[in-house]
């Protein structure tokens, strides 16, 4: 819906996205003490969640909120992004050993129940709040809907539905102190079950989200976390050259499904676009080669969910419909579109065209469930190619890149090039480089590129018109 707004300016789409994110971020579906979003709400107010927290939900929300923040600069979204990433780095990290220098990845989920009761870990009563917060309890209770009878089965789910807008810096600091005190007490409760499996596909989603958020908000720790999780999957979840689906306590299980390759390849491409490190692009190309060999349907096009070598499936399914996570075929459409632009290899475009032909449908009710695929169609046809030429350590190069990162261009494909690095011969910016010895940025749509931009402010203005 946000992409639809960015493409055609539909204000109703924009309003729907902003309203939904605002209500979710104020409601009880959000963990106001620990950060992170629960799996879903059971009511129309986003008040009462199913208290289970999933890695994939939070990864997808971080990515979406980052993209929306690029345009709106919403303080609420920036706060929720930071809090959610802080939660993931505090509570979801899985390491292979006790060595703090080892790469880490992310666990799958926290259960909803503790001590046999759903939500018990998360809810409060008024007496607890009064006892713990003392003189500051009245202010806290007025912000978080706390009253004697509770708002859920006699208990209180903390929420800011009545006060969704952030207050002054001083007001928020006072509330933060109170939340921190409550969080310390909550941490001593019996925790919900932690599902510490590392799933390649879900980690791919989080790597992509952390990479984007880390560069947009200039948070090196987030980007390093993305690199760590990527390294974990590449080194600990690959057996005999092939990716596996799960890792737990040193044990690999299950041959990778399409979603594993699709999401990890997208993660590699995202890391390449945001760091300029070609080793990520090389790995993306290698993974797509494996995916084409093991999952591509040579007869009809598109990708099967399971590998050709899989022996434990009755039939090989193929779907483009998004569920709680993006469809593997939808993600691969975006992967192919990006790799075609980044490398100039026409095989990627040919496969994307075959998928377009296979999955295109005039039935609008079918297309509603294929939004990731539709985004891939748009990217293939109307990508905004941004090329920044300059030495990576040059402050002027960094300023141009930061402008790109903080500007909302959902269809962008970014290439960071040193002055002597070549572009594919068919790339519209082929042969372009520094201007008067200074770093420069080029914006290309189709076969046409804009005049070079050396000034970050001018680049931001040019990007706003794409």
Residue locations for each model-derived region?
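Glycan-recognition and catalytic cores of secretory/periplasmic carbohydrate-active enzymes
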Residues: 1-466
């Amino acid at each position: 819906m946000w992409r639809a707004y960015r493409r055609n300016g539909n204000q109703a789409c924009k309003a729907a996205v902003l309203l939904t994110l605002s209500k979710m971020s104020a409601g009880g579906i959000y963990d106001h003490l620990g950060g992170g979003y629960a799996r879903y709400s059971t009511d129309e107010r986003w008040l009462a969640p199913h208290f289970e927290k999933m890695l994939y939900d939070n990864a997808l929300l971080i990515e979406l909120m980052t993209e929306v923040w690029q345009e709106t600069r919403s303080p609420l979204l920036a706060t929720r992004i930071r809090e959610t990433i802080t939660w993931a780095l505090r509570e979801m990290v899985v390491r292979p050993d006790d060595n703090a220098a080892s790469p880490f990845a992310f666990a799958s989920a926290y259960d909803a129940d503790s001590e046999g009761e759903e939500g018990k870990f998360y809810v409060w009563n008024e007496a607890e709040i009064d006892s713990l917060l003392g003189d500051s309890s009245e202010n806290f209770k007025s912000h978080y809907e706390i009253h004697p009878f509770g708002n859920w089965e006699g208990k209180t789910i903390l929420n800011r539905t009545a006060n969704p807008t952030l207050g002054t810096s001083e007001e928020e600091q006072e509330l933060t102190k109170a939340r921190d005190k409550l969080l310390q007490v909550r941490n001593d409760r019996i925790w919900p079950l932690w599902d510490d499996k590392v799933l390649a596909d879900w980690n791919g989603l989080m790597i992509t989200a952390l990479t984007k958020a880390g560069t947009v908000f200039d948070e090196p720790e987030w980007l390093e976390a993305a690199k760590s999780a990527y390294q974990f999957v590449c080194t600990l979840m690959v057996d005999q050259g092939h990716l596996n689906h799960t890792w737990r306590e040193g044990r690999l299980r299950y041959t990778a499904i399409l979603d594993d390759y699709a999401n990890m390849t997208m993660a590699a491409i995202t890391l390449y676009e945001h760091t300029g490190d070609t080793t990520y692009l090389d790995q993306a190309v290698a993974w797509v080669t494996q995916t084409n060999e093991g999952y591509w349907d040579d007869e009809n096009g598109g990708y099967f969910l399971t590998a050709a070598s899989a022996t434990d499936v009755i039939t090989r399914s193929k779907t483009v419909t998004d569920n709680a996570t993006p469809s593997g075929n939808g993600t691969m459409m975006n992967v192919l579109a990006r790799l075609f632009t980044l490398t100039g290899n026409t095989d990627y475009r040919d496969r994307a065209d075959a998928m377009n032909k296979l999955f295109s449908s005039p039935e609008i009710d079918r297309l509603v469930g294929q939004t990731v695929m539709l985004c891939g169609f748009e990217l293939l046809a109307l990508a905004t190619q941004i090329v920044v030429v300059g030495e990576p350590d040059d402050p002027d190069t960094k300023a141009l890149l930061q402008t790109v990162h903080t500007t909302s261009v959902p269809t962008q494909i970014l290439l960071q090039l040193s002055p002597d690095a070549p572009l594919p011969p068919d790339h519209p910016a082929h042969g372009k480089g520094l201007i008067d010895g200074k770093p420069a940025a080029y914006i290309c749509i189709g076969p046409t590129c804009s005049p070079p931009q050396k000034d970050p402010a001018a680049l931001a203005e040019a990007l706003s018109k794409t």
